[in-house]
Amino acid sequence: MMNKYEMIIHWSEEDQLFIAEVPELPGCMADGHSYQEAVSNAVIMINEWIETAKDLGRTIPKPKGKLMYA
């Protein structure tokens, strides 16, 4: 599933992993040994976050799509 949520990806010296955070979805983050793996894992976590929110009847924020203009 394609999504348009903004991701912030950075290297963690402490964990020796790339960390991908999704600020628009509280608590949604993933990691990976490569940049691409972190992004791929974040996409999975976004989809799981949305499915869980639906199951719990919670509001799902609309993506702001900031990166579309970068």
Feature names for model-found ranges:
Residues 1-6, 40-70:
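Short, charged, surface-exposed hinge/linker loops at domain edges
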Residues 10-25:
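Short aromatic-glycine-(Arg/Gly/Cys) micro-motifs in beta-strand/loop hairpins
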Residues 24-27, 62-64:
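Hydrophobic residues in alpha-helical membrane-spanning segments
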Residues 26-37:
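A short, exposed loop/beta-hairpin motif centered on an aromatic-Gly-Thr core
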